[in-house]
Amino acid sequence: MSHPLTFLGIESSCDDTAAAVVRAAERAEILSSVVDGQAALHAPFGGVVPEIAARAHAERLDLCVERALQEAGLGLGDLDGIAVTAGPGLIGGVLSGVMLAKGLAAGTGLPLVGVNHLAGHALTPRLTDALAFPYLMLLVSGGHCQFLIARGAEAFSRLGGSIDDAPGEAFDKTAKLLGLPQPGGPSVEAEAATGDPRRFAFPRPMLDRPGCDMSFSGLKTALLRARDGIVAEKGGITRQDRADLCAGFQAAVVDVLAEKTRRALAIYAEEQAPVPALAVAGGVAANGPIRAALTRVAEEAGARFLAPPLRLCTDNAAMIAWAGIERFRAGGRDGMDLQARPRWPLDQSAPALIGSGRKGAKA
Protein backbone atom coordinates (compact mmCIF):
# COMPACT_ATOMS: atom_id res chain seq x y z
CA MET A 1 0.00 0.00 0.00
CA SER A 2 1.28 3.50 -0.84
CA HIS A 3 2.25 5.82 1.98
CA PRO A 4 -0.66 8.16 2.89
CA LEU A 5 -0.31 11.60 1.35
CA THR A 6 -2.14 14.85 2.09
CA PHE A 7 -1.99 17.59 -0.54
CA LEU A 8 -3.27 21.12 -0.86
CA GLY A 9 -4.68 21.89 -4.30
CA ILE A 10 -4.97 25.35 -5.87
CA GLU A 11 -7.06 26.10 -8.98
CA SER A 12 -7.43 29.46 -10.78
CA SER A 13 -7.43 28.72 -14.52
CA CYS A 14 -10.71 30.42 -15.49
CA ASP A 15 -13.44 32.03 -13.37
CA ASP A 16 -13.47 29.83 -10.25
CA THR A 17 -11.02 30.49 -7.44
CA ALA A 18 -10.60 27.23 -5.56
CA ALA A 19 -8.55 25.47 -2.90
CA ALA A 20 -8.92 21.97 -1.45
CA VAL A 21 -7.22 19.42 0.75
CA VAL A 22 -7.20 15.77 -0.34
CA ARG A 23 -5.79 12.78 1.52
CA ALA A 24 -4.86 9.55 -0.26
CA ALA A 25 -4.54 6.50 1.98
CA GLU A 26 -6.43 3.24 1.46
CA ARG A 27 -8.95 5.39 -0.38
CA ALA A 28 -9.02 9.00 -1.48
CA GLU A 29 -10.76 11.45 0.81
CA ILE A 30 -11.64 15.07 0.12
CA LEU A 31 -11.06 16.80 3.46
CA SER A 32 -12.19 20.18 2.17
CA SER A 33 -13.12 21.83 -1.12
CA VAL A 34 -13.66 25.57 -1.40
CA VAL A 35 -14.85 27.13 -4.66
CA ASP A 36 -15.39 30.88 -4.93
CA GLY A 37 -17.16 31.51 -8.24
CA GLN A 38 -17.08 34.76 -10.19
CA ALA A 39 -20.37 34.45 -12.09
CA ALA A 40 -21.77 37.66 -10.62
CA LEU A 41 -18.68 39.62 -11.70
CA HIS A 42 -18.89 38.50 -15.33
CA ALA A 43 -22.69 38.37 -15.78
CA PRO A 44 -23.02 41.98 -17.03
CA PHE A 45 -20.58 41.20 -19.86
CA GLY A 46 -22.17 37.96 -21.08
CA GLY A 47 -18.97 35.96 -20.62
CA VAL A 48 -15.70 35.72 -18.73
CA VAL A 49 -13.54 38.87 -18.88
CA PRO A 50 -9.89 37.77 -18.40
CA GLU A 51 -8.75 40.97 -16.67
CA ILE A 52 -11.62 40.86 -14.16
CA ALA A 53 -11.00 37.16 -13.54
CA ALA A 54 -7.29 37.70 -12.90
CA ARG A 55 -7.91 40.49 -10.39
CA ALA A 56 -10.50 38.42 -8.55
CA HIS A 57 -8.14 35.46 -8.30
CA ALA A 58 -5.38 37.66 -6.90
CA GLU A 59 -7.77 38.99 -4.24
CA ARG A 60 -9.33 35.66 -3.24
CA LEU A 61 -6.75 32.89 -3.56
CA ASP A 62 -5.09 33.26 -0.16
CA LEU A 63 -8.50 33.44 1.54
CA CYS A 64 -9.62 30.26 -0.21
CA VAL A 65 -6.45 28.45 0.88
CA GLU A 66 -6.91 29.60 4.48
CA ARG A 67 -10.53 28.45 4.46
CA ALA A 68 -9.68 25.07 2.90
CA LEU A 69 -7.11 24.39 5.62
CA GLN A 70 -9.54 25.46 8.34
CA GLU A 71 -12.31 23.22 7.02
CA ALA A 72 -9.89 20.30 6.82
CA GLY A 73 -8.75 20.97 10.38
CA LEU A 74 -5.12 21.08 9.27
CA GLY A 75 -2.21 23.46 9.09
CA LEU A 76 0.50 23.78 6.47
CA GLY A 77 2.71 21.57 8.61
CA ASP A 78 0.28 18.67 8.19
CA LEU A 79 0.65 18.64 4.41
CA ASP A 80 2.90 16.47 2.26
CA GLY A 81 2.82 18.69 -0.82
CA ILE A 82 1.22 21.53 -2.75
CA ALA A 83 -0.37 21.04 -6.16
CA VAL A 84 -1.33 23.93 -8.40
CA THR A 85 -2.87 24.34 -11.82
CA ALA A 86 0.00 25.53 -14.03
CA GLY A 87 -2.09 25.61 -17.23
CA PRO A 88 -3.80 25.64 -19.61
CA GLY A 89 -6.08 28.59 -18.92
CA LEU A 90 -6.37 32.35 -18.72
CA ILE A 91 -2.79 33.31 -18.03
CA GLY A 92 -3.49 35.99 -15.42
CA GLY A 93 -5.37 33.61 -13.17
CA VAL A 94 -2.97 30.72 -13.71
CA LEU A 95 -0.04 32.99 -12.85
CA SER A 96 -1.70 34.09 -9.59
CA GLY A 97 -2.15 30.48 -8.52
CA VAL A 98 1.38 29.45 -9.45
CA MET A 99 2.93 32.39 -7.61
CA LEU A 100 0.95 31.64 -4.45
CA ALA A 101 1.91 27.95 -4.60
CA LYS A 102 5.57 28.84 -5.06
CA GLY A 103 5.45 31.14 -2.05
CA LEU A 104 3.86 28.47 0.12
CA ALA A 105 6.34 25.83 -1.06
CA ALA A 106 9.32 28.11 -0.49
CA GLY A 107 8.12 29.10 2.97
CA THR A 108 7.33 25.57 4.16
CA GLY A 109 9.80 23.43 2.23
CA LEU A 110 6.93 21.31 0.92
CA PRO A 111 7.19 19.69 -2.53
CA LEU A 112 5.62 21.72 -5.35
CA VAL A 113 3.75 19.89 -8.12
CA GLY A 114 2.46 21.71 -11.20
CA VAL A 115 -0.68 20.12 -12.62
CA ASN A 116 -2.24 20.26 -16.06
CA HIS A 117 -5.82 21.45 -15.49
CA LEU A 118 -7.08 18.91 -18.03
CA ALA A 119 -5.29 16.10 -16.20
CA GLY A 120 -7.20 17.17 -13.11
CA HIS A 121 -10.48 16.54 -14.92
CA ALA A 122 -9.20 13.39 -16.62
CA LEU A 123 -8.01 11.79 -13.36
CA THR A 124 -11.15 12.62 -11.38
CA PRO A 125 -12.65 9.10 -11.89
CA ARG A 126 -9.67 7.71 -9.98
CA LEU A 127 -10.38 10.13 -7.12
CA THR A 128 -14.09 9.29 -6.94
CA ASP A 129 -14.20 5.64 -8.08
CA ALA A 130 -10.61 4.33 -7.91
CA LEU A 131 -10.89 3.56 -11.63
CA ALA A 132 -8.00 1.53 -13.01
CA PHE A 133 -6.04 2.45 -16.14
CA PRO A 134 -6.66 2.37 -19.06
CA TYR A 135 -10.03 4.06 -19.51
CA LEU A 136 -11.68 6.27 -22.11
CA MET A 137 -12.30 9.84 -21.02
CA LEU A 138 -14.58 12.40 -22.65
CA LEU A 139 -13.46 15.78 -21.35
CA VAL A 140 -16.20 18.24 -22.21
CA SER A 141 -16.20 21.74 -20.76
CA GLY A 142 -16.39 25.43 -21.53
CA GLY A 143 -12.93 25.54 -23.07
CA HIS A 144 -12.20 21.98 -24.13
CA CYS A 145 -13.74 18.93 -25.76
CA GLN A 146 -11.67 15.85 -26.47
CA PHE A 147 -11.57 12.08 -26.24
CA LEU A 148 -8.58 10.71 -24.35
CA ILE A 149 -7.36 7.26 -23.45
CA ALA A 150 -5.90 7.60 -19.95
CA ARG A 151 -3.05 5.13 -19.47
CA GLY A 152 -1.25 6.73 -16.55
CA ALA A 153 -1.00 9.86 -14.42
CA GLU A 154 0.91 11.58 -17.23
CA ALA A 155 0.12 9.27 -20.14
CA PHE A 156 -2.80 10.31 -22.33
CA SER A 157 -3.59 9.60 -25.98
CA ARG A 158 -6.00 11.94 -27.74
CA LEU A 159 -8.41 10.29 -30.18
CA GLY A 160 -10.09 13.49 -31.32
CA GLY A 161 -11.60 16.76 -30.20
CA SER A 162 -13.38 19.93 -31.21
CA ILE A 163 -11.67 21.84 -34.00
CA ASP A 164 -13.33 25.13 -32.99
CA ASP A 165 -15.76 25.95 -30.17
CA ALA A 166 -16.04 23.64 -27.18
CA PRO A 167 -19.61 22.61 -26.28
CA GLY A 168 -19.60 24.68 -23.10
CA GLU A 169 -18.59 27.76 -25.08
CA ALA A 170 -21.41 27.06 -27.54
CA PHE A 171 -23.90 26.74 -24.66
CA ASP A 172 -22.71 30.08 -23.26
CA LYS A 173 -23.01 31.80 -26.64
CA THR A 174 -26.46 30.30 -27.18
CA ALA A 175 -27.58 31.67 -23.83
CA LYS A 176 -26.20 35.10 -24.72
CA LEU A 177 -27.96 35.10 -28.11
CA LEU A 178 -31.27 34.24 -26.44
CA GLY A 179 -30.98 36.60 -23.49
CA LEU A 180 -30.50 33.87 -20.88
CA PRO A 181 -28.28 34.26 -17.80
CA GLN A 182 -24.72 32.98 -17.56
CA PRO A 183 -23.35 30.38 -17.18
CA GLY A 184 -25.17 29.21 -20.25
CA GLY A 185 -25.14 25.46 -19.67
CA PRO A 186 -27.69 25.30 -16.84
CA SER A 187 -29.78 28.10 -18.39
CA VAL A 188 -30.08 26.42 -21.79
CA GLU A 189 -30.77 23.01 -20.24
CA ALA A 190 -33.57 24.42 -18.07
CA GLU A 191 -35.12 26.28 -21.00
CA ALA A 192 -34.85 23.23 -23.28
CA ALA A 193 -36.89 21.14 -20.83
CA THR A 194 -40.11 22.77 -22.09
CA GLY A 195 -39.09 23.01 -25.76
CA ASP A 196 -39.66 20.94 -28.89
CA PRO A 197 -36.29 19.62 -30.14
CA ARG A 198 -37.80 18.75 -33.55
CA ARG A 199 -39.04 22.20 -34.50
CA PHE A 200 -35.72 23.40 -35.92
CA ALA A 201 -33.58 21.23 -38.21
CA PHE A 202 -30.21 22.14 -36.75
CA PRO A 203 -27.13 20.47 -38.27
CA ARG A 204 -25.10 17.69 -36.66
CA PRO A 205 -21.62 18.90 -37.71
CA MET A 206 -18.98 16.42 -38.87
CA LEU A 207 -21.09 13.29 -38.43
CA ASP A 208 -20.54 12.73 -42.14
CA ARG A 209 -16.77 12.54 -41.57
CA PRO A 210 -14.88 9.60 -40.07
CA GLY A 211 -13.03 9.86 -36.80
CA CYS A 212 -13.70 11.51 -33.46
CA ASP A 213 -13.14 15.19 -34.27
CA MET A 214 -16.06 17.57 -33.69
CA SER A 215 -17.21 21.08 -34.53
CA PHE A 216 -19.77 23.26 -32.77
CA SER A 217 -19.32 26.74 -34.26
CA GLY A 218 -21.60 25.99 -37.22
CA LEU A 219 -24.34 24.85 -34.86
CA LYS A 220 -24.13 28.15 -33.03
CA THR A 221 -24.40 30.01 -36.35
CA ALA A 222 -27.45 27.94 -37.34
CA LEU A 223 -29.16 28.90 -34.10
CA LEU A 224 -28.38 32.58 -34.69
CA ARG A 225 -29.96 32.41 -38.15
CA ALA A 226 -33.03 30.62 -36.81
CA ARG A 227 -33.45 33.26 -34.12
CA ASP A 228 -33.05 36.09 -36.61
CA GLY A 229 -35.59 34.43 -38.91
CA ILE A 230 -38.16 34.37 -36.12
CA VAL A 231 -37.46 38.00 -35.24
CA ALA A 232 -37.81 39.05 -38.88
CA GLU A 233 -41.13 37.23 -39.16
CA LYS A 234 -42.70 38.12 -35.79
CA GLY A 235 -40.76 41.16 -34.62
CA GLY A 236 -39.45 39.22 -31.61
CA ILE A 237 -39.36 35.77 -30.05
CA THR A 238 -41.77 34.23 -27.56
CA ARG A 239 -40.82 32.14 -24.56
CA GLN A 240 -41.86 29.04 -26.50
CA ASP A 241 -39.66 30.06 -29.42
CA ARG A 242 -36.74 30.39 -27.05
CA ALA A 243 -37.45 27.03 -25.42
CA ASP A 244 -37.68 25.34 -28.83
CA LEU A 245 -34.40 26.91 -29.95
CA CYS A 246 -32.67 25.69 -26.79
CA ALA A 247 -34.16 22.21 -27.14
CA GLY A 248 -33.08 21.94 -30.77
CA PHE A 249 -29.58 23.16 -30.01
CA GLN A 250 -29.15 20.82 -27.05
CA ALA A 251 -30.47 17.82 -29.02
CA ALA A 252 -27.90 18.49 -31.74
CA VAL A 253 -25.05 18.62 -29.22
CA VAL A 254 -26.29 15.40 -27.62
CA ASP A 255 -26.44 13.62 -30.98
CA VAL A 256 -22.92 14.71 -31.96
CA LEU A 257 -21.39 13.71 -28.63
CA ALA A 258 -23.22 10.37 -28.61
CA GLU A 259 -22.14 9.35 -32.10
CA LYS A 260 -18.55 10.47 -31.66
CA THR A 261 -18.44 8.61 -28.35
CA ARG A 262 -19.54 5.42 -30.13
CA ARG A 263 -16.59 5.82 -32.48
CA ALA A 264 -14.16 6.52 -29.65
CA LEU A 265 -15.38 3.45 -27.76
CA ALA A 266 -14.76 1.32 -30.85
CA ILE A 267 -11.14 2.53 -30.95
CA TYR A 268 -10.73 2.14 -27.19
CA ALA A 269 -11.99 -1.46 -27.41
CA GLU A 270 -8.65 -2.35 -29.01
CA GLU A 271 -6.99 -1.57 -25.65
CA GLN A 272 -8.59 -4.75 -24.25
CA ALA A 273 -9.02 -3.22 -20.80
CA PRO A 274 -10.03 -5.77 -18.13
CA VAL A 275 -13.11 -3.66 -17.32
CA PRO A 276 -13.93 -1.35 -20.25
CA ALA A 277 -14.89 2.07 -18.89
CA LEU A 278 -16.11 5.39 -20.29
CA ALA A 279 -15.69 8.34 -17.96
CA VAL A 280 -16.91 11.88 -18.56
CA ALA A 281 -15.70 15.03 -16.83
CA GLY A 282 -15.84 18.79 -17.21
CA GLY A 283 -18.63 21.29 -16.65
CA VAL A 284 -20.80 20.11 -19.54
CA ALA A 285 -20.82 16.64 -17.95
CA ALA A 286 -23.35 18.12 -15.51
CA ASN A 287 -25.93 18.32 -18.33
CA GLY A 288 -28.66 15.72 -17.70
CA PRO A 289 -29.56 14.81 -21.32
CA ILE A 290 -25.87 14.51 -22.25
CA ARG A 291 -25.23 12.20 -19.29
CA ALA A 292 -28.26 10.09 -20.18
CA ALA A 293 -27.18 9.73 -23.82
CA LEU A 294 -23.62 8.79 -22.90
CA THR A 295 -24.90 6.25 -20.38
CA ARG A 296 -26.91 4.55 -23.14
CA VAL A 297 -23.93 4.57 -25.52
CA ALA A 298 -21.71 2.97 -22.87
CA GLU A 299 -24.31 0.30 -22.11
CA GLU A 300 -24.61 -0.53 -25.81
CA ALA A 301 -20.84 -1.00 -25.97
CA GLY A 302 -20.70 -3.08 -22.80
CA ALA A 303 -18.63 -0.45 -21.00
CA ARG A 304 -18.95 0.85 -17.47
CA PHE A 305 -20.05 4.50 -17.39
CA LEU A 306 -18.68 6.86 -14.77
CA ALA A 307 -19.41 10.52 -14.16
CA PRO A 308 -18.23 12.42 -11.09
CA PRO A 309 -20.65 14.13 -8.70
CA LEU A 310 -21.89 17.40 -10.15
CA ARG A 311 -19.72 19.43 -7.74
CA LEU A 312 -16.63 17.74 -9.20
CA CYS A 313 -17.67 18.19 -12.84
CA THR A 314 -17.02 21.92 -12.84
CA ASP A 315 -13.65 23.45 -11.96
CA ASN A 316 -12.48 22.63 -8.44
CA ALA A 317 -9.23 22.24 -6.54
CA ALA A 318 -9.88 18.73 -5.19
CA MET A 319 -9.13 17.32 -8.64
CA ILE A 320 -5.92 19.36 -8.74
CA ALA A 321 -4.81 18.08 -5.35
CA TRP A 322 -5.54 14.52 -6.48
CA ALA A 323 -3.73 14.93 -9.80
CA GLY A 324 -0.80 16.34 -7.83
CA ILE A 325 -0.75 13.25 -5.62
CA GLU A 326 -0.86 11.00 -8.69
CA ARG A 327 2.00 12.87 -10.34
CA PHE A 328 4.02 13.00 -7.11
CA ARG A 329 3.70 9.24 -6.65
CA ALA A 330 4.94 8.81 -10.22
CA GLY A 331 8.05 10.85 -9.37
CA GLY A 332 6.92 14.23 -10.69
CA ARG A 333 7.66 17.48 -8.88
CA ASP A 334 8.69 21.01 -9.78
CA GLY A 335 11.04 23.72 -8.61
CA MET A 336 10.79 27.48 -8.37
CA ASP A 337 11.15 27.64 -12.15
CA LEU A 338 7.61 26.26 -12.62
CA GLN A 339 5.94 28.40 -15.28
CA ALA A 340 2.30 29.32 -15.88
CA ARG A 341 1.23 28.11 -19.33
CA PRO A 342 -1.77 29.39 -21.30
CA ARG A 343 -1.57 26.31 -23.55
CA TRP A 344 -0.57 22.84 -22.50
CA PRO A 345 -1.71 19.81 -24.52
CA LEU A 346 -2.19 16.61 -22.53
CA ASP A 347 -1.07 14.50 -25.48
CA GLN A 348 2.15 16.18 -26.60
CA SER A 349 2.55 13.77 -29.52
CA ALA A 350 -0.86 14.42 -31.09
CA PRO A 351 -1.09 16.82 -34.04
CA ALA A 352 -2.60 20.20 -33.23
CA LEU A 353 -6.33 20.47 -33.77
CA ILE A 354 -7.35 22.74 -36.64
CA GLY A 355 -8.65 25.39 -34.25
CA SER A 356 -5.47 25.61 -32.19
CA GLY A 357 -4.32 28.96 -33.52
CA ARG A 358 -0.86 30.37 -34.22
CA LYS A 359 0.44 29.90 -30.67
CA GLY A 360 0.01 26.14 -30.76
CA ALA A 361 -2.36 23.56 -29.42
CA LYS A 362 -4.49 24.55 -26.46
CA ALA A 363 -5.07 21.01 -25.28
Swiss-Prot record:
Main location as per UniProt: cytoplasm
Reaction catalysed by this enzyme: L-threonylcarbamoyladenylate + adenosine(37) in tRNA = N(6)-L-threonylcarbamoyladenosine(37) in tRNA + AMP + H(+)
UniProt signal peptide: none
Positions bound to substrate: L139, V140, S141, G142, G143, D172, G185, N287
Keywords: Acyltransferase, Cytoplasm, Iron, Metal-binding, Transferase, tRNA processing
Enzyme class: transferase
Cofactor: binding details: Binds 1 Fe(2+) ion per subunit.
The protein's name: tRNA N6-adenosine threonylcarbamoyltransferase
Organism, scientific name: Cereibacter sphaeroides (strain ATCC 17025 / ATH 2.4.3) (Rhodobacter sphaeroides)
